[in-house]
């Protein structure tokens, strides 16, 4: 994605990430089943569960109820610096349905955009668990990942994102001794934007250098970022979609400092060791303007299946392809219609290089190692993220409109969808589309050809 940020959104007062655990709210993970397959007729059901990211949770002093963070400002008494903040603050359990609009039923996970309880929650980010204390790690190379999605209620400006990142399975507990909450409480997030809006990173606060956001009442940017490789299997609303690999020179989770992080949060986008843009496949951007949308070939007014295949073996990733199933019909990805890209309908290193030239984009993907480096990250196992968010940085225009907004829409690659360049303003969508919901279901995983 072009301008991804960590999904803090407009959170409940005091919601923040911390590394110790409080006792005010019991933590009970919603249960969710998924399947491992050896062939389309031979799948085993796994009993899984999901956890919400710690950045959404209520964080308070370890001995009481005093918020460590309110609105987009730290409590300077409890959090005068990074280390003291981690020592003083704990995060608490989550009421998934009432507070965050997160529910499960069998193999389905439903995420509601705006949930009103004692406070107002916007969006969510969840992880699939292997156990109550460990994230499940997926070995993607040589395998395929399939899921059903209903995003008929997601308009311009929203993003139902399902993706993988190279987080630590334990949420960073083994690496960082001050992190005693771990995966059970959703700690350890990282991605290719090296997000700096995380309140705690590597077991310490992100207090020092914190600047409150000017357009998000509950977010800000700190002096630390958390980086790792990212594979966006699915970023979409009912108007447009994209899938995008983002390699990092160091694939595993690691921290960075201030503007050296690069990405969305920094003054120099390409200053870090990760590729914030990635190599994206968006059918509309590739010239197929009637392929995806309400009433189109892939009809987003109805549920459909997404199957993503990761070609290669070991740590060698050679190609990423994607097809769809709807109404019992298999729908192949169409080839691009741009003159220099007509031979492509999947992501390869050759495609990525040609696309960057055709679209006049900076080729950071190749600079950071391309599919070879993406494969290096995948080989260590990746955590599944399922989320719903809006974009306080670019209004999601990089996904569903003309971007940059002052670009000639007829120029190759600049028009990514039909949404207006004035659409996607968070204050607008949080009001007009509060009831928006995305449902992910029927996850299947196995060797290429094994799920369908």
Curated annotation (Swiss-Prot):
Its recorded reaction(s) are: Hydrolysis of (1->4)-beta-D-glucosidic linkages in cellulose and cellotetraose, releasing cellobiose from the non-reducing ends of the chains
Q: Which CDD domains match?
A: GH7_CBH_EG
Question: InterPro entries, from UniProt?
Answer: ConA-like_dom_sf, Glyco_hydro_7, Glyco_hydro_7_sf
In terms of SUPFAM superfamilies, this protein maps to: Concanavalin A-like lectins/glucanases
Instruction: Say yes or no: keyword Glycoprotein present.
Output: yes
Protein name from the UniProt record: Exoglucanase 1
- Per the Swiss-Prot or TrEMBL record, the active site comprises 230, 235
Q: What is the lineage of its organism?
A: Eukaryota, Fungi, Dikarya, Ascomycota, Pezizomycotina
């Amino acid at each position: 994605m072009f301008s991804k940020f960590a999904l803090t959104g407009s959170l409940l007062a005091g919601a923040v990430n911390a590394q110790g655990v409080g006792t005010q709210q019991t933590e009970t993970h919603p249960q969710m089943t998924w399947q491992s397959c050896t062939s389309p007729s031979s799948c085993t059901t796994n009993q899984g569960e999901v956890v919400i990211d710690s950045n959404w949770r209520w964080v308070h002093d370890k001995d009481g109820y005093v918020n460590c963070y309110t609105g987009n400002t730290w409590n300077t008494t409890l959090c005068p610096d990074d280390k003291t903040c981690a020592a003083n603050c704990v995060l608490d359990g989550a009421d998934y349905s009432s507070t965050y609009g997160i529910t499960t039923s069998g193999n389905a996970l439903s995420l509601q955009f705006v949930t009103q309880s004692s406070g107002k929650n916007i969006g969510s980010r969840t992880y699939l668990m292997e156990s109550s204390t460990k994230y499940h790690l997926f070995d993607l190379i040589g395998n395929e990942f399939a899921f059903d999605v209903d995003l008929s209620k997601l308009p311009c400006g929203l993003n139902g994102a399902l993706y993988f990142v190279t987080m630590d399975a334990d949420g960073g507990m083994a690496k960082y001794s001050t992190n005693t909450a771990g995966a059970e409480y959703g700690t350890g997030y990282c991605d290719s934007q090296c997000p700096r809006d995380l309140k705690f990173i590597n077991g310490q606060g992100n207090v020092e250098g914190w600047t409150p956001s000017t357009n998000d009442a509950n977010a800000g940017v700190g002096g630390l970022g958390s980086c790792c490789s990212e594979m966006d299997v699915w970023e979409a609303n009912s108007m447009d979609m994209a899938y995008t690999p983002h390699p990092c020179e160091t694939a595993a989770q690691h921290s960075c400092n201030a503007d050296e992080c690069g990405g969305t949060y920094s003054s120099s986008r390409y200053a870090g060791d990760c590729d914030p843009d990635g190599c994206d496949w968006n059918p509309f951007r590739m010239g197929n303007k009637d392929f995806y949308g309400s009433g189109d070939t892939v009809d987003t007014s109805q549920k459909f299946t997404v199957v993503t295949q990761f070609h290669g073996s070991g740590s060698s990733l050679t190609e990423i392809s994607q097809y769809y199933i709807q109404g019992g019909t298999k729908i192949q990805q169409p080839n691009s219609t741009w003159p220099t890209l007509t031979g492509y309908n999947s992501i390869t290193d050759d495609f990525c290089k040609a696309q960057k030239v055709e679209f006049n984009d900076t080729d950071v993907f190749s600079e950071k190692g391309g599919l070879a480096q993406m494969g290096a990250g995948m080989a260590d196992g990746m955590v599944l993220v399922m989320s719903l968010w809006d974009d306080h940085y670019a209004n999601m225009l990089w996904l569903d409109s003309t971007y940059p907004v002052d670009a000639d829409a007829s120029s190759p690659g600049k028009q990514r969808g039909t949404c207006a360049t004035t659409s996607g303003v968070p204050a607008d969508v949080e009001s007009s589309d509060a009831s928006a919901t995305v449902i992910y279901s029927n996850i299947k995983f196995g060797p290429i050809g094994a799920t369908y």
